[in-house]
């Protein structure tokens, strides 16, 4: 911090309370080196360095407004106010450890959560359906594949595969129930 006597600093505080922007800037410049050295090793989730710096400047503004300069040393009051505010922000952010970032990798295919939300090709929906389809046996996979993906009707599939129509319907319904359980 640049050497400024306590009396000069108190005069700047009084001027800035009355609305003098030049004295307010001098106070910000006075505490600037302290803020830079203090915040150098501070990390707060979802805050970048400029956000932390602005929080410190906000603490200075609150100190200007609230500090009784007749009772307290303004420099000590402001420094403790800055530290307390930043430590409060750190404690407050520590409560949210289980947050998920939109840029976090969520699958083994290096996709982010944001990719899944924006997915216009329904790639991820298809992945879960494919996983559910692999859990079916070959006959059930075949009937689902022919009826729903290749466009056969139940009658056409029963004639093509040489099975009874009722058996075809039972297999199809059984396969659909298994798929529903897997997808839910």
Swiss-Prot record:
Signal peptide: none annotated. One of its GO terms (molecular function) is DNA-binding transcription factor activity. Keywords: Plasmid. One of its GO terms (biological process) is DNA-templated transcription initiation. It comes from the Bacteria. It holds the Pfam family Sigma70_r2. NCBIfam families: sigma70-ECF. This is Uncharacterized protein CA_P0167. It comes from Clostridium acetobutylicum (strain ATCC 824 / DSM 792 / JCM 1419 / IAM 19013 / LMG 5710 / NBRC 13948 / NRRL B-527 / VKM B-1787 / 2291 / W).
């Amino acid at each position: 911090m640049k050497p400024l006597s306590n009396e000069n600093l108190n005069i700047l505080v009084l001027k800035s309370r009355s609305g003098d922007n030049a004295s307010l800037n001098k106070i910000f410049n006075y505490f600037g080196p302290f803020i830079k050295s203090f915040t150098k090793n501070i990390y707060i989730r979802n805050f970048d360095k400029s956000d932390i710096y602005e929080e410190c400047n906000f603490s200075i503004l609150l100190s200007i407004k609230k500090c009784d300069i007749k009772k307290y040393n303004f420099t000590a009051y402001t420094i403790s106010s800055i530290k307390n505010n930043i430590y409060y922000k750190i404690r407050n952010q520590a409560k949210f450890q289980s947050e998920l970032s939109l840029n976090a990798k969520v699958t083994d295919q290096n996709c982010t959560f944001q990719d899944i939300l924006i997915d216009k090709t329904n790639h991820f929906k298809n992945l879960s359906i494919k996983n559910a389809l692999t859990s079916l046996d070959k006959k059930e996979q075949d009937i689902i594949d022919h009826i729903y993906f290749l466009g056969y009707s139940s009658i056409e599939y029963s004639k093509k595969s040489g099975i009874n129509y009722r058996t075809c319907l039972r297999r199809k319904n059984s396969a659909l129930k298994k798929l529903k359980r897997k997808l839910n």
